[in-house]
Amino acid sequence: MRRKTRNFKHKTVKDNKVLTEGSDQESEKDNSQCCDPATNERVQAEKRQYVCTECGKAFSQSANLTVHERIHTGEKPYKCKECGKAFSHSSNLVVHRRIHTGLKPYTCSECGKSFSGKSHLIRHQGIHSGEKTYECKECGKAFSRSSGLISHHRVHTGEKPYSCIECGKAFSRSSNLTQHQRMHRGKKVYKCKECGKTCGSNTKIMDHQRIHTGEKPYECDECGKTFILRKTLNEHQRLHRREKPYKCNECGKAFTSNRNLVDHQRVHTGEKPYKCNECGKTFRQTSQVILHLRTHTKEKPYKCSECGKAYRYSSQLIQHQRKHNEEKETS
């Protein structure tokens, strides 16, 4: 039995003339044109028979059009059984599920670091190539990805587009919102064996544990000072560069970190959000509460290596040690 073939009546463009497939003009083309790039491009265009009614984009397969249309409809039929997050494409769900399974099949040939998705590996490889084409006009800092520049720019604008639907708290990065939302869902699964503190991510608990171990893996190339956290090193390095990108709108004073700016702004607002549970006294900064609590606990963590005398504050120890130095100089 002879198989019937459907004759699709779609239009294509050739030499600014609209031709219909199967016409005499089209059949008269020279066979030698089959290898011509322009002709091949036209043939490929003819194959794109499935057109999106929203934006006009064309596809050669109906399945590809169906997936594309989800951009306009917002449909996300592929749902993760672990956390409920939904996706418009099945491949995105496959990559997402690796978060739960821990599978990281894409490995960097330079440093051996592994990733759950190929796109994550490609972005990471920009670190090794050193290519940083996206530069911040405010402070000159450069990034290998446009997304990195967009996130960084919020440092200057103060924009926090990611809000928690539970409590309204806003964040500048979606990853910070995700970690915060785990608190509401009760998913603080990472626990410190030393003090019992829990965190929403493995990286945060690893950073925290360095408080107990004393490990400071991040070293400044300029002065050799070491730090527990990478972000603290970054803030410190701005001192060497004399870079202070965080500026107070009230008085113009500038700071090396957003945290220091927020603490400073409370001078103008009078806000004292940190309260002592023992006596009810309030403070502008968490560090002030920690120092104040020692008046209740009688803790004296700063000990003199010369005579063993202990002090509540580091400034008291420094002042005490000067006496030993003076005694050595006069003796």
UniProtKB/Swiss-Prot annotation:
Subcellular location(s): the record lists: Nucleus
Gene Ontology biological process: regulation of transcription by RNA polymerase II
* Matches recorded under SUPFAM superfamilies: beta-beta-alpha zinc fingers
Question: Main subcellular localization, coarse class?
Answer: nucleus
- Chain positions with Phosphoserine modification: 23
Q: Which InterPro entries match?
A: Znf_C2H2_sf, Znf_C2H2_type
Which sequence ranges does the entry mark as zinc finger (C2H2-type)? 50-72, 78-100, 106-128, 134-156, 162-184, 190-212, 218-240, 246-268, 274-296, 302-324
**Key words of the record:** DNA-binding, Metal-binding, Nucleus, Phosphoprotein, Repeat, Transcription, Transcription regulation, Zinc, Zinc-finger
Origin species: Homo sapiens
At the top level, the lineage of the source is Eukaryota
Q: What is the name of this protein?
A: Zinc finger protein 660
Under Gene Ontology molecular function, one entry of this record is: zinc ion binding
Identify its protein family: Belongs to the krueppel C2H2-type zinc-finger protein family.
Spell out the GO cellular component terms annotated for this protein, sorted alphabetically and separated by semicolons. nucleus
